[in-house]
């Protein structure tokens, strides 16, 4: 760049910083920019690896969607529990008015410190979310769910009134306001969404999510969660086998998948994942129904192997470290919680 251009650029940058504040524009190579992405674990080893950075990125919008009873709220509560373990502050905006505090507690959530709001309208819910984000003191906000964010005009109107596009406009306006503040305050905002069917679709998937297209664009990560099977102990169903596909990922390669078990009243089975992924990466040997690690049997059947790892956490950690290494993914440990560390 010649001297005249360099001087003109320096003057423009100085004017921008004077008008909009220091840090409003800078070079990507400047030391002030944090190169590492701060993340929080999802509570699932396989999903952390599938996300490519070791968890969900902070300072971003995340959308988790799927059919009913697929594990959307369970996954979000696991992320809340992981953030609280780091000393972070969590808020849950329960637009569905369906949060069970006892279930949340079983998943490891400190319900005594969890901020909860059960708003009357969609505008109120999103305004509360925006105020919490702008405060800079909340590390994670979960909105459950986009489908339940009913516009005020719809609530005040009559049954059967045509309210075309109201919901989509509400989401679009809210996300325009939220996004910049989310980045500045490094807050992770998770929107839970439901699936609807488009009528008359001949080709492609007829499934779509509620709330228009704005969330699809603003979300840095979109997760599609599905229940693919039941886990039984005898005739009793004790959990569900769950598959999560990373449909969109702005921080790592997308389209990776993770399969894990969600046990009722317990949440994501970390030990079950370690057993399955240990076998997949040849760290755990499987012969018939028996599982063995370093030549020693750890259990007959997956349930017994899971219980063994629960009773021997040091062995579980050793296998987990081997899995992370074998996955050869640049997994960032979710300890870079600047605000949480200051708390």
UniProtKB/Swiss-Prot annotation:
Keywords noted in UniProt: ATP-binding, Cytoplasm, DNA damage, DNA recombination, DNA repair, DNA-binding, Nucleotide-binding, SOS response
Record GO biological process: DNA recombination; DNA repair; SOS response
Coiled-coil regions listed in the entry: none
Amino-acid positions noted as binding ATP in the UniProt annotation, renumbered to this chain: 66-73
PROSITE patterns for the chain: RECA_1, RECA_2, RECA_3
Entry-linked CDD domains: RecA
UniProt subcellular location: Cytoplasm
GO cellular component: cytosol
Gene Ontology molecular function terms on file: ATP binding; ATP hydrolysis activity; ATP-dependent DNA damage sensor activity; damaged DNA binding; single-stranded DNA binding
SUPFAM superfamilies listed in its UniProt record: P-loop containing nucleoside triphosphate hydrolases, RecA protein, C-terminal domain
InterPro entries, A to Z: AAA+_ATPase (IPR003593), DNA_recomb/repair_RecA (IPR013765), DNA_recomb/repair_RecA_CS (IPR020584), P-loop_NTPase (IPR027417), RecA-like_C (IPR049261), RecA-like_N (IPR049428), RecA_ATP-bd (IPR020588), RecA_C_sf (IPR023400)
A Pfam family assignment: RecA
Database matches in SMART domains: AAA
NCBIfam families noted in UniProt: tigrfam_recA
PANTHER family listed in its UniProt record: MITOCHONDRIAL DNA REPAIR PROTEIN RECA HOMOLOG-RELATED, RECA
Similarity comment: family membership: Belongs to the RecA family.
The protein's role, per its UniProt record: Can catalyze the hydrolysis of ATP in the presence of single-stranded DNA, the ATP-dependent uptake of single-stranded DNA by duplex DNA, and the ATP-dependent hybridization of homologous single-stranded DNAs. It interacts with LexA causing its activation and leading to its autocatalytic cleavage.
HAMAP family: RecA
Protein name stated in the entry: Protein RecA
Organism: Dechloromonas aromatica (strain RCB)
């Amino acid at each position: 760049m010649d001297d005249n251009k360099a001087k003109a650029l320096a003057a423009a940058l100085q004017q921008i910083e004077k008008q909009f504040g220091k840090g409003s524009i800078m070079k990507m190579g400047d030391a002030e920019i944090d190169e590492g992405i701060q993340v929080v674990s999802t509570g699932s080893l396989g999903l952390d690896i599938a996300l490519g950075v070791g968890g969900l990125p902070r300072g971003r919008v995340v959308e988790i969607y799927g059919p009913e009873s697929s594990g959307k709220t369970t996954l979000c509560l696991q992320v809340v529990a992981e953030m609280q373990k780091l000393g972070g502050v969590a808020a849950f905006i329960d637009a569905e008015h369906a949060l069970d505090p006892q279930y949340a507690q079983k998943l490891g959530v400190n319900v005594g410190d969890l901020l909860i709001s059960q708003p009357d309208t969609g505008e109120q819910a999103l305004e509360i979310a925006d105020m919490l984000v702008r405060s800079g003191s909340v590390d994670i906000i979960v909105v459950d769910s986009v489908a339940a964010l009913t516009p005020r005009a719809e609530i005040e109107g009559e049954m059967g009134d045509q309210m075309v596009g109201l919901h989509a406009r509400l989401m679009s306006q809210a996300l325009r306001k939220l996004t910049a503040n989310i980045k500045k305050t490094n807050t992770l905002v998770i929107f839970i969404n439901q699936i609807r069917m488009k009528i008359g679709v001949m080709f492609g998937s007829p499934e779509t999510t509620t709330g228009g297209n704005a969330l699809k664009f603003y979300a840095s990560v979109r997760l599609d969660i599905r229940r693919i099977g039941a886990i039984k102990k005898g005739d009793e169903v004790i959990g569900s086998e769950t598959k999560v596909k990373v449909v969109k990922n702005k921080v790592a390669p997308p389209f990776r998948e993770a399969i894990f078990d969600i046990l009722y009243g317990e949440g994501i089975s970390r030990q079950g994942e370690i057993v399955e992924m240990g076998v997949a990466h040849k760290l755990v040997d499987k012969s018939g129904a028996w599982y063995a690690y370093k030549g020693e049997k750890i259990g007959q059947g997956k349930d017994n192997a899971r219980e063994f790892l629960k009773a021997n956490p040091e062995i579980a950690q050793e296998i987990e470290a081997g899995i992370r290494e074998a996955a050869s993914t640049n997994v960032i440990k979710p300890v870079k919680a600047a605000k949480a560390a200051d708390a």
